[in-house]
Amino acid sequence: MPFYIILIINTLFTFGISATRPIVSIYSTTLGYYSFTLGILIASYSFLSMLLAARTGRWVDHLGARKMAFCGALGVFLALLLPWLIPNLFFLFLSQIIMGISQLFIVLSIQKTVGNMNGDREKLIATHSLSGAIGDMLGPLASGYIYAHFGFQVTFGVAMSAVLLGILMSFLLKSSDWKSGEPIKQSGVPLQQESVWRLLRDTNLRNAILISGVVLYSRELITAYFPLYGSNIGMTSSEIGIVLSLSASMSLVVRLLQYRLVKMIGRSRVMSGTVLLSAFTFLFVFLTDIPLLLAIIFAFMGAFLGMGQPLSMVYAMDLSPVERHGEILGLRLSINRVLQFVAPIIFGGIGGVFGIGSIFLVNSFILFISSRFIRIDPAITGPIFPRKANDGA
């Protein structure tokens, strides 16, 4: 039961965050801001988390997942409350900065807790990712409709309600339910930890983190820039929300097939193949502005990117010791946040000069390069470090 409560909480928080991210882009244009300013606004989401991701992972390792998740939950609620009270550009910036670091607290805490529970890690991570995909699917679908009919503040109010429900549900969990995400007991013996950079000498771990960063940042690119692209070609906010939800729903569907595909083809081949196929979908977005074709393309894009995200997380945990999982998962997200921070500023300039569609073309090239040169040894099929001490049920 605690496992499923954590999954529901994850869905509620993902819903609240994913419902508002595309609306921030759309609403900013109504305030008269475009291209470069929007790029900086989108990048602000990643600013603090880019600087603190690996350190946040260490905080999760040393302070425990329960405390960090609760701090993150309060932060997300505050991030939604501020622009709801005062909807102007300054509070949108402040909201995105707080949202980015708070979401990081929640994600790392839940990932470490779920990934170290008893059972098959592949299935645990797939189920966890499925709960997030449900939130990603429902969030834009609901917010697109609500924003079109009721406006900005009602949209953020609904998102806040989902987050508040998640906070209230967290009180159903006991301290022991977070056991698998709590600090490892060392029986009085100081833990001798090598530098995280020494861990990254492992080529496979390094590649898993790099692939993860590229995949996660590509998903964020969709959330941030497709609303602008859709608006430019005449799509309504409801239609944009439907396309984003369709993409997320395919991400959900493909995760139901993930375990079987990995067993049939192999985890490494599935991950490399989905990155390559994702590159083609970004290229096709650049080549068309027909809404129906875009919906189909984004459905496939959601499926391919949705497969790569949980697989890279499994690799990151399999290739690192359990007492360093928070730090490694944080480092994994720091690569994502660096790309999220730098890319919107660069892409905002590119979009201003060459059009928003060119952003998808550039990312297609990045994914092609990643699929060709960043690979993981197919021989690695399970954990190389034993689980210990805090395995939870």
Model regions: which residues?
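Helix-to-loop junctions at the C-terminal end of transmembrane segments
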Residues: 52-64, 147, 254-266, 351-352
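Juxtamembrane intracellular "pre-TM" segments in multi-pass secondary transporters
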Residues: 1, 175-209, 392-393
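Conserved MFS/SLC helix-loop-helix module at the cytosolic interface between two early adjacent transmembrane helices
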Residues: 51-87, 265
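C-terminal membrane-cytosol helix-exit motif in multi-pass small-molecule transporters
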Residues: 160-183, 370-378
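Structural signature of the two symmetry-related core transmembrane helices
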Residues: 67-81, 160, 269-284
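Cytoplasmic helix-loop-helix junction between adjacent transmembrane helices
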Residues: 97-133, 315
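Helix-loop boundary and gating motifs at the non-cytosolic
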Residues: 1-46, 206-211, 215-233, 240
